């Protein structure tokens, strides 16, 4: 970039493009924040269904949290198992080795 280009006033198209990019980024961030509860509810139900195959767990004892950071998302799952549920867990069928 030369000095003349640097000092030249920017055109309206580049200013409009930057404004549009800011608006789109804001809308995407807003949509992803409001869309997360649906994802968390779906994940919670699927996780509960998988766990129910092995152990009986009260649905209100499962907490799921989704955190988004820069370039990475973290899914946290906290499940409170009753002591007797672990001892009564359905045993996994063993495969015969041929």
From Swiss-Prot:
One of its GO terms (biological process) is regulation of division septum assembly. InterPro entries: MinE, MinE_sf. SUPFAM superfamilies: Cell division protein MinE topological specificity domain. Keywords: Cell cycle, Cell division. Signal peptide: none annotated. Belongs to the MinE family. Prevents the cell division inhibition by proteins MinC and MinD at internal division sites while permitting inhibition at polar sites. This ensures cell division at the proper site by restricting the formation of a division septum at the midpoint of the long axis of the cell. HAMAP family: MinE (MF_00262). This is Cell division topological specificity factor. It comes from Methylorubrum populi (strain ATCC BAA-705 / NCIMB 13946 / BJ001) (Methylobacterium populi).
